[in-house]
Amino acid sequence: MKIGVIRFPGTNCDRDVAKAIELAGLTPEYVWWSEENLTDFDGIVIPGGFSYGDYLRAGAMASITPVIDGIKELVKEEKPVLGICNVAQILGEIGLVPGIFITNENPKFNCEWVDLKVSTNRTPFTKAFKNNQIIALPIAHAEGRFYTEDIDLLKDQDQIVLQFEGKNPNGSMEAITSVCDESGLVCAMMPHPERACEELFGSDDGLNFFKGFL
């Protein structure tokens, strides 16, 4: 299976993501922001970083690039899309997932390992976990605080994927740090699963997110 790895100017986790995809037994292929046709891919991962330097606001400029049309077409074909960190903000900008990710309650860059509760395992990326299972992944963001005006709808439609467990390091509403669309095939997450794919680095919980494409 071939998984596209989207690159924007300022993306800095693309190689980590490509390695994680290989560890999951899949074939990664880099795709530039200028590409529109993604139909050859079985799924897409959009790595984090600082797309276009996060000028204006995080994800704003990336949200109007040509590759976004290709991603939307892939969603129509019901192929899985995983957006990590900065891209969670982009997916919110273009309306593929609910809510927005805004500046942390403590407006500083926050980089640490966190415990997370798997709030739903109905997505391809969390299907290997049990509901309410606790996993460990790192976070690294300054604009990762989740907010929505439709929190009850998200709960009713089972669109909350991950929540901080034990502490809420950025002040996110309901400690939410990952959400999905109604189908569960499009997932936006602030934590970095690609940095937790080998026990050597402290946890391999992140590998299951990439095995979800299988």
Language model regions located:
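Amide-donor transfer/coupling interface in amidating biosynthetic enzymes
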Residues: 41, 73, 104-214
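Short, flexible active-site-adjacent loop segments at beta-strand->alpha-helix junctions, enriched
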Residues: 87-88, 122
